[in-house]
Amino acid sequence: MPLLPEQCRAARGLLNWTQQRLAAAAGVSRSTIKDFECHRHALHESTEHLLIEAFEQAGAHLLPDGRDGPGVRLKRLPR
């Protein structure tokens, strides 16, 4: 499932993460995040995987493009 810039911004918002926080969690530069979210360039497949993994580890589940479009939701945390 390709990560969309809008999903990236939405996932960061749900996690209350800055671009810098995501960059640190994924091991990429903040400018990579900024340029991707502003539609300046696409991500390399390996970078996309790192971002998705960082979101999943933090509890943000990326939803594929379905009837209502792609999305993001937070996973339930165990009590």
Predicted regions mapped to residue ranges:
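A detector for short, charged/polar N-terminal pre-domain segments
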Residues: M1-L3
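Short alpha-helical DNA-recognition segment
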Residues: N16-K34
